[in-house]
Amino acid sequence: MKRKSVLFLTSVVLAAMLLGGCGKDEEKDSASVLDDVSEETVEVEESEVVEAETEETEETEEIPEGMYRSELTNEWIDESLKDQRPIAAMVDNEKTALPHYGLSDADVVYELMNSTKNGRITRLMAVVKDWGKIEQLGSVRSTRPTNILLAAEWNAVLCHDGGPFYIDPYLAEDYSAHFSGGFDRINNGKAREFTEYICTGNLDSKFDASNYSREYDKYYEGKDVDGYQHFQFSDEELTLDDKDGVINATTVSLPFPHNESALKYNEETKTYDYYDYNNKHVDPGNGDAVLTFKNVLLQNCTFHQYDENGYMIYNCLDASNRDGYYLTNGKAIPITWVKVGDTNATRYYDMDGNEISINTGKTYISLVPDDGWKDLSIE
């Protein structure tokens, strides 16, 4: 309530006003009751004026029948998939393994240093929600401990073919679900290690022969009151133009010498096309579709080398808010990231400490070795 001082006029002045106001409709202040005509200042309460608020019509998003927004991309997909857990497939990124099949169907793709040897060769991990539509994905290779931890934050079933003994304690964890080997072999004229692919029916057979649930289980940390949540998606298209520290980001060169990995912004599609070995990545299993991403997340990450053979693990469990970048629509902003537990999602924050939102679409994530962070180029 507001208060105001009301100056009570002398009886003579009041009488003159009343006489002058005869015959006219006047608004009267309900708080102005004259009990004394002497001149004094009195505190009285004035009722707040409540203005009629214009009722704003909230725009309700029209939900296509039988569809829901994917927790991996925020794109509309079949509602029957809502509770289905994704798979995370290890894909060989050696030049001999090219071309890759099925990567354009992945929702999230990780690129990680697979070894400190051989020019820090990378391996890809493709996270796929609608794995039932896979016709051919791969070629499939071995996993590393880091991949087990990253797959766990999606509650994804890791698909691989073996790996060094360093993976054993991670695979033994109750939260770990994985299928190792036994996928189809394709006669492609290459050495045997480049011939294994996840093909139609493989995953159904694997699930049928296992005790793993096809649906999210109790180890999934991404469930909230609105459903399954991992990334925070923006309701509107983000441009980053108004964000602190924004820089132009149309070309990204990653410090992986063997693969010469890069991302180039495509003005027509408004996405980042992936390149390796100086060539644009295409998927012959999907009409030579370009592997392209709406979002790019780069994480500065320390690592531990196990032995002289180059086997290593990223220290991806880190609560110290390490550096990173988020890229979309040709711009980049500095961010920090944390992952506080094996099954916890990696969270990304802006320079004010707020969790970032990202655009609807596919996402590329790379853990960049901390000793090579200075060699990361964003232009």
Labelled PLM ranges:
Residues M1-F8, V13:
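Positively charged n-region of N-terminal signal peptides that target proteins for export
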Residues S5-L7, V44, T57-T60:
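Intrinsically disordered, low-complexity repeat segments enriched in small/polar residues
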Residues V13-L14, D323:
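Exposed boundary/loop context
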Residues L18-G21:
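C-terminal motif of bacterial Sec signal peptides marking the signal peptidase cleavage site
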Residues G23-D25:
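Bacterial signal peptide processing site
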Residues A31-E56:
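Post-signal peptide N-terminal segment of mature Sec-exported envelope proteins
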Residues A52, E58-Y110, K117-E379:
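A surface/extracellular/periplasmic glyco- and lipid-processing/surface-interacting theme
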